[in-house]
Amino acid sequence: MAEGGSPDGRAGPGSAGRNLKEWLREQFCDHPLEHCEDTRLHDAAYVGDLQTLRSLLQEESYRSRINEKSVWCCGWLPCTPLRIAATAGHGSCVDFLIRKGAEVDLVDVKGQTALYVAVVNGHLESTQILLEAGADPNGSRHHRSTPVYHASRVGRADILKALIRYGADVDVNHHLTPDVQPRFSRRLTSLVVCPLYISAAYHNLQCFRLLLLAGANPDFNCNGPVNTQGFYRGSPGCVMDAVLRHGCEAAFVSLLVEFGANLNLVKWESLGPESRGRRKVDPEALQVFKEARSVPRTLLCLCRVAVRRALGKHRLHLIPSLPLPDPIKKFLLHE
């Protein structure tokens, strides 16, 4: 094997010298290099040139390359035209490519889908087009983040609403390969991967509420089992603990109480005006928590929590169709 080569015969980094882009093309493009030299399809997707896309895709040679991963004029990682258009937020190009046969859930070398990069770059229109075309609202299990997590972190409530409307899971599913590994073989050992946690850490109250309305677990924001003993020492032990430690306003605490959080998970006696976290505990938030902890929840509140949990988060959208009086349905929907 030549120096700098790989076991499969592809050239290694050394063979391309300092031209990293060329090496990436050699390693990850879908077709031989001579086919990858023509990047007009990918370049048109990048600049949003719909007319050029229409013209090129009239030819069979380009239609056959619509899902080809290739390095384009301004990019380093080989991507499909759809992924490139979604990154740039060219909604008309995204829509056209899908109608011409582009696969919506193909991933790049990082495991990112077109939907994920549309969300990351804040493109609501492209996000909606991809969701309407059947893109998985949860992104790819081969990527460490999800569209919901990113939208919650940056406070894009409009994008988060769209993801939830199309069935995105608002809880963490901590199984990378559920088809292969035994069920529950991986346990949650940190809250930092959870949408509720990250929305609280960045004080995005609207996103926090949307997640709870969609049925997010108010304690650990996780689908599977939780290993609290595996949490880092000094890290929050539940979502309520995180809300207090991050100095969130009282509204965050009130929402968790309203949605049935287990208040006994927090050792609130150890919390004072100063927190071991990066911020001070909000005095009003701490007072709301202590008051909620000191008195039993009302029967009305307990009934609402019980009904919503019995329905399950994937059937909460059916509440408006239940044969119940409108005031009760609004109550169940927290309206």
Curated annotation (Swiss-Prot):
InterPro entries: Ankyrin_rpt, Ankyrin_rpt-contain_sf, ASB1_SOCS, SOCS_box, SOCS_box-like_dom_sf. One of its GO terms (molecular function) is ubiquitin-like ligase-substrate adaptor activity. It is found in: Cytoplasm. GO terms for biological process: intracellular signal transduction; male genitalia development; negative regulation of cytokine production; proteasome-mediated ubiquitin-dependent protein catabolic process; protein ubiquitination. Its main location: cytoplasm. Pathway: Protein modification; protein ubiquitination. Residues 286-335 form the SOCS box domain. Keywords: ANK repeat, Cytoplasm, Developmental protein, Repeat, Ubl conjugation pathway. GO terms for cellular component: cytosol; ubiquitin ligase complex. PROSITE patterns: ANK_REP_REGION (PS50297), ANK_REPEAT (PS50088), SOCS (PS50225). ANK repeats lie at residues 36-68, 77-106, 110-139, 143-172, 191-220, 235-265. It holds the Pfam family Ank_2. The SOCS box domain mediates the interaction with the Elongin BC complex, an adapter module in different E3 ubiquitin-protein ligase complexes. Probable substrate-recognition component of a SCF-like ECS (Elongin-Cullin-SOCS-box protein) E3 ligase complex which mediates the ubiquitination and subsequent proteasomal degradation of target proteins. Mediates Notch-induced ubiquitination and degradation of TCF3/E2A and JAK2. Functions as a tumor suppressor by enhancing CHCHD3 'Lys-48'-linked ubiquitination, leading to inhibition of the CHCHD3/ROS signaling pathway. Suppresses TAB2-linked 'Lys-48' polyubiquitination and consequently facilitates the initiation of NF-kappa-B and MAPK signaling cascades. May play a role in testis development. Interacts with CUL5 and RNF7. Interacts with TAB2 and TAB3. Belongs to the ankyrin SOCS box (ASB) family. This is Ankyrin repeat and SOCS box protein 1. It comes from Homo sapiens (Human).
